[in-house]
Amino acid sequence: MAFLPNGDMLVTELTGDLRIIRNNKLVAMPVSGVPDSIYGGQGGLMDVVLHPDFASNQIIYLSLSVGVHEAKTLRVVRARFTGDALEDVQTVFEAAPQRDTYVHYGARLAFLADKTLLITNGDGFDYREESQNLGTHYGTIVRVSEDGKVPSDNPFLNDASV
């Protein structure tokens, strides 16, 4: 959930809806324009976080599971929140490789003071041993810029195996 400057609260539902709570009451209609996610197990629409400059740019970030039954992954998108809808939805990160499990996505989002975004990536349960493999996103925390680019001061930036 994320608290808006006006006191409203944005809440994600695993089933795929982004909801608004206003004055301690659920707004009847979900936010429109939310990208489709694949719901099951621990997957669906998972986290929401406001851009550090939300008051001036109205940008939010969502984490969601996407794909089909046999090939799913974690995706992070950013969009402009208009009060009841999302516009200009853009993918900023997609975990690799895909997996066939519906659990252990991670999917938590947090901004650092330098406005880079941290994204937790779960181990996919059946793939937990791959968390030690720097060539996958399993079991990692990824740091990206607000538009999804890799910051020049990221660790392992020039390591070809990563």
Regions found by a protein language model. Give the residues of each.
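Beta-propeller blade signature
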Residues: 74-85, 132-147
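Acidic, Gly/Ser/Thr-rich repeat motifs that build Ca2+-stabilized beta-propeller blades
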Residues: 1-128
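Short helix/strand-bridging catalytic loops that position acidic/His residues to coordinate divalent metals
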Residues: 125-131, 159-162
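Short, surface-exposed recognition loops and adjoining beta-strand edges that mediate ligand/DNA contacts
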Residues: 97, 102, 153-162
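The feature captures the short pre-catalytic strand/loop hairpin that immediately precedes
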Residues: 119-123, 149-159
